[in-house]
Amino acid sequence: SEFFPPASGNQWTTGAISCAQWTGVRLRDVLQHCGIADSAVYIGYNAADTHLSGDPNKAPISRGVPMHKALEDETLIAWALNGADIPPLHGYPLRLICSGWPASASGKWLNEILIRDRVHDGAKMTGSAYRVPCAPTAPGNPVADSQMCIIQSMPVKSLITFPKSGIQQTLATPLNLRGHAWAGDRSVSAVAVSIDFGASWQRCELQPAVNRLAWQQWSTKVTFPQTGYFEIWARATDNQGESQPMVVPGWNPKGYLNNACHRIAVAVV
């Protein structure tokens, strides 16, 4: 885990993110074929999965997105992942794809799309599920339900994918770094790294995205001034000028939207 003390559940570290090629039909085309009433404001999905508890009386996840997101060119009903049928664990035979938003909006094992005249109120759309306080809140303070907002576009974030944390590096050898960055509905305009705990930053080479909602690859190399313990921090900035914070951002009940700078440890010898 990258948290201390570690959170419960799967310790995915940096393994809970990927960028895939999806093939399908635009959700917009399907909805327009069926007809969209002027009163439509949201879509919701129902799927073939069951509640994690196995209790048939409990509703499984049923989330949704506003119509403006549902009608984007990139929002799909997908049947292929990286050129092959979607694997069962990823939602075969059909999956909703709402890129740039929480993955829970991209429902697996899709069997029904609802067009709603109100915000969808399915399972995991209310309470603290995928919702955060609308205004900054002191840690642990109660938040009225009316003051909780549904998470939409994900914040700017980057990862160092090479090397792994904890390596040894010889002082005389430059260290190659690389990773990925993304910014929800926005694009990434810059990535920088620091080896002195944020006192100074070195700009990285940033590759363009293959499309509007795909992640971007970055790379650079660093040299160290002396032997000892170092941390490498990565910080991305989006096209609206927002950068990753160096500490965990504002508190929320479930710990969502933590886009603090990723960091790795290096022992220079």
Residue ranges and their predicted role:
Residues 1-269:
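Structured, non-membrane catalytic/scaffold regions adjacent to prosthetic-group chemistry
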